[in-house]
């Protein structure tokens, strides 16, 4: 018997069928679901995130869905803390945590831990905010591009919270956020080589996707069209009508939402919005595949196979998760 309690990771690109398989697994295994998705944490963002239906959530509850207002931010560190607490509760009941989603950074943070970043510094933050008021957020973004080009490439100039944090880390520690993360990766690699691990669970890693990438692209396009038919534009209009949300927030920068927001701002026609939304979703899937290709001990399932449940159960049995 394993010394550590079991957990299951069910990963994959967007539109691959992760939720359906996860629900099927809960019907035959003592599993409880934890969502691993940076967009599903937000309330009022249902259609564009392909959130499980209210019926599905009532019958098969998912933790870490609908836990935040769209005006709030949610970090990988927040996720790790919340997920560890949920996993402990599930394990204490004698059940298996089944973590399902496509935010690969969250899976990685949970598995390997996070770099020890310096604490917030009120004086440094005040100076950065004063600089932003005087010179604009683009000027701060230009500063970040000099000291941490990797972070600058992923942080939008209109995302003040993340922009300030990245510059704050550099000014307080003298190291970029990217350097801190690289240091953590090296430490995690060393820990794995020595048999130590950050996550106190025996994890079985499952991934699901269509074997043919063209099929996934077709599914992405169809799902985006269905979202529009289901009222995606009205959903974003409701968010805009609040008056306290803007395109720089992490929630509104989620794939699909930023394109619809730009359309409602008059920056894109409806056809352009739909095309760019589909392209952005395909790019997201490509990034997810990049993460998954480097994942150790990963068992793949084909989205189009009719026997994925039995295949998943066979694999879980083979790695002693079910013993």
Swiss-Prot record:
Cofactor(s) annotated in UniProt: Mg(2+)
Highest taxon of source: Bacteria
Entry's EC annotation: 2.5.1.75
Nucleotide-binding is among the record's keywords: yes
Keyword ATP-binding: yes
GO terms for MF: ATP binding; tRNA dimethylallyltransferase activity
Site entry (Interaction with substrate tRNA), positions: 103, 125
Keywords: ATP-binding, Magnesium, Nucleotide-binding, Transferase, tRNA processing
Gene3D superfamilies: 1.10.20.140, P-loop containing nucleotide triphosphate hydrolases (3.40.50.300)
Annotated segments matching region Interaction with substrate tRNA: 37-40, 161-165
GO biological process: tRNA modification
Binding site for substrate: 14-19
The reaction(s) this protein catalyses: adenosine(37) in tRNA + dimethylallyl diphosphate = N(6)-dimethylallyladenosine(37) in tRNA + diphosphate
Annotated ATP binding sites: 12-19
SUPFAM superfamilies: P-loop containing nucleoside triphosphate hydrolases
Subunit record text: Monomer.
Similarity comment: Belongs to the IPP transferase family.
Protein task: Catalyzes the transfer of a dimethylallyl group onto the adenine at position 37 in tRNAs that read codons beginning with uridine, leading to the formation of N6-(dimethylallyl)adenosine (i(6)A).
Protein name: tRNA dimethylallyltransferase
Organism classification: Bacteria, Pseudomonadati, Pseudomonadota, Gammaproteobacteria, Pseudomonadales
């Amino acid at each position: 018997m394993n010394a550590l309690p079991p957990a299951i990771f069910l990963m994959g690109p967007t539109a691959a069928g992760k939720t359906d398989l996860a629900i099927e697994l809960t019907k035959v295994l003592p599993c409880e679901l934890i969502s691993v998705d940076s967009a599903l944490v937000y309330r009022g963002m249902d259609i564009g995130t392909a959130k499980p239906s209210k019926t599905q959530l009532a019958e098969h509850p998912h933790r870490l869905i609908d836990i935040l207002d769209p005006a709030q931010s949610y970090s990988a560190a927040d996720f790790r803390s919340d997920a560890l607490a949920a996993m402990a509760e599930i394990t204490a009941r004698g059940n298996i945590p089944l973590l399902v989603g496509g935010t690969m950074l969250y899976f990685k943070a949970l598995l390997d831990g996070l770099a020890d970043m310096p604490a917030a510094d009120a004086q440094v933050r005040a100076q950065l905010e004063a600089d932003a008021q005087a010179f604009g957020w683009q000027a701060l973004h230009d500063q970040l591009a000099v000291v941490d080009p990797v972070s600058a490439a992923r942080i939008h100039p209109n995302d003040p919270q993340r922009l300030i944090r990245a510059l704050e880390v550099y000014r307080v520690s003298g190291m970029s956020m990217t350097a801190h993360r690289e240091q953590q990766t090296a430490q995690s690699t060393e820990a794995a080589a020595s048999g130590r691990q950050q996550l106190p669970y025996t994890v079985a890693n499952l991934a699901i996707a269509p074997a043919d990438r063209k099929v996934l692209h077709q599914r992405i396009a169809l799902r985006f069209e269905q979202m529009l038919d289901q009222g995606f534009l009205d959903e974003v209009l409701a968010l805009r009508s609040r008056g306290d949300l803007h395109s720089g927030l992490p929630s509104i920068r989620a794939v699909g939402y930023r394109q619809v927001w730009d359309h409602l701002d008059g920056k894109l026609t409806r056809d352009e919005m739909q095309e760019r939304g589909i392209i952005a979703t395909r790019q997201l899937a490509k990034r997810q595949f990049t993460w998954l290709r480097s994942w150790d001990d990963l068992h793949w399932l084909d989205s189009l196979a009719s026997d994925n449940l039995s295949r998943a159960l066979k694999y879980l049995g083979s790695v002693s998760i079910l013993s």
